[in-house]
Amino acid sequence: MIPFKNTPWGKPIIAQEIAPGVWVVATASHGGFYLNTDALARIPDAHQAYAARWSHGHGPNWFEEDVAACAVIVAFPELIVACPELFDAESVEDARAIVRCYIDREISQ
């Protein structure tokens, strides 16, 4: 069962659990990831705070697809095996670079 009825970006069109507690979500206009409390524990607090800024008041469980989602990909490298149609080793390396260049840089300022 989907643990949410709405997202920060509107009503979900697609919501699929791709790993325990990790949901990929798409709406008509945007998307990202939703993490339950157990999955969220794998995300560093600073990355959760960064993601919460883009969740439009929906809290730290939402990671928008443009930048914040990279924190999820880095924290869950097993998504390469669980979802090879969405992720590969290059996806994880790209996500690490984005976390380093954007998220970590912004939270350190």
Question: Which positions does each model-derived feature cover?
Answer:
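A short, structured beta-strand/loop element
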Residues: V25, S29-G57
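Short, compact, well-ordered microdomains
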Residues: P60-Q109
